[in-house]
Amino acid sequence: MWREIVLKYSIMENKKSLSQIEQDLINFWDKEKIFEKFLKNNLSRAKAEKKTFSFFDGPPFASGSPHYGHIMVSFIKDAVLKYWSLRGFSVEQTFGWDCHGLPVELYVEKKIGIKSKKDIFKLGENEYKSIEKFNEICKNSVFDCIDEWHQMFKRIGRWGDFKNAYSTMDNKYI
């Protein structure tokens, strides 16, 4: 399989841009379910040997776009998780999102131009409806940010269980 990829993207023959090669690789990983196969193989081997490695990955705030610092930390965390997985340990790779109030609220206030708390009360027909509307905008903003982060993680090759990700606003988590 690896040889096939290397031959397909030989420098001499390749007419594709780096971004197209990147997208082809992401599509290949998704189509062939590479992470799922890796995880299944790793977990079955680790269960037999009863070896686990615990790693508590502090979840990022879902309140904006990832920046260079997030990407660097992700490389380090991913390297640690892959290292211990390849050493035969069971490594849980579940993602989580910190969605607690203040960072999300500040992000949304800046995004929609709210200058004071009084501006929030102008969003609806009364105070209750206004706060409800603001909370809905914040919640939708969190999902937008999570989608953006997920795409970034895929682009840098960071593996993780995104399907079973938790968020601090889920009742199951609370």
Summary of predicted features, one role per range:
Residues 2-174:
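N-terminal, positively charged nucleic-acid-binding surface of large information/translation enzymes
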